[in-house]
Amino acid sequence: MAADNAYLMQFVDETSFYNRIVLSHLLPANLWEPLPHFLQTWLRNYLAGTLLYFISGFLWCFYIYYLKINVYLPKDAIPTIKAMRLQMFVAMKAMPWYTLLPTVSESMIERGWTKCFASIGEFGWILYFVYIAIYLVFVEFGIYWMHRELHDIKPLYKYLHATHHIYNKQNTLSPFAGLAFHPVDGILQAVPHVIALFIVPIHFTTHIGLLFMEAIWTANIHDCIHGNIWPVMGAGYHTIHHTTYKHNYGHYTIWMDWMFGSLRDPLLEEDDNKDSFKKAE
């Protein structure tokens, strides 16, 4: 038992270290040090998530909409400031709830309820990468079906997912739309990351990093720029999802859509649009 407690303390020490790093640079000590460990962790996740959302979003928008204007997107496809402000407002209302999920997952890990491990040396590098691959496949499968059911189950779409799908044209989508969800919707789509903890051994620090990478990834797939990197589910695929509502539910890759018959290729979409335009002429 003492050995188990000593092992679990590695997780507590690591989260406490992250709390100090973030909170000590953003808040006076008297505001956060008296808080219980759980609330410190939530506050750290909330502040870090908010900073990541705005910094990545602003840098992304500045680059593609201003430095590279008319390079990646035509000027008339750039979303309005008003649309981006609305996306920020929706995301900020949900952010306190979004960041509760990683806080709860860290708490479960600290209590030893999951298969998380503290050091890569416990399994070695080969198994580390094998477990990451299994973890990501599980997450991909889980997010695909969670996302698809949020469309197929009408009450879930009406009361949850429709909040995100008001951005249904290229000139209304921006990197800031990536987290503009109803909070319950956003949490449901991230739940596979937490369920995976009980099934697949995963390195603790890697799990935290993958959760926060979601903010970067969701910004990327809402910028409407088709990178055309197989088998990545990039923004070209996701833009089709926002316009057809019934294709490209996948997350990182196109594999789940390919397996379950919901894939629509943006290059084929362009060809179809060109053919339709020629017929109209």
Swiss-Prot record:
A motif (Histidine box-3) lies at residues 238-242. InterPro entries: Fatty_acid_hydroxylase, Sterol_Desaturase_Related. Changing G234D: 98% activity loss. It holds the Pfam family FA_hydroxylase. Its EC number is 1.14.19.20. It catalyses: a Delta(7)-sterol + 2 Fe(II)-[cytochrome b5] + O2 + 2 H(+) = a Delta(5),Delta(7)-sterol + 2 Fe(III)-[cytochrome b5] + 2 H2O. Keywords: Endoplasmic reticulum, Iron, Lipid biosynthesis, Lipid metabolism, Membrane, Oxidoreductase, Steroid biosynthesis, Steroid metabolism, Sterol biosynthesis, Sterol metabolism, Transmembrane, Transmembrane helix. Its main location: endoplasmic reticulum. Its cofactor is Fe cation. Belongs to the sterol desaturase family. This is Delta(7)-sterol-C5(6)-desaturase 1. The gene is STE1.
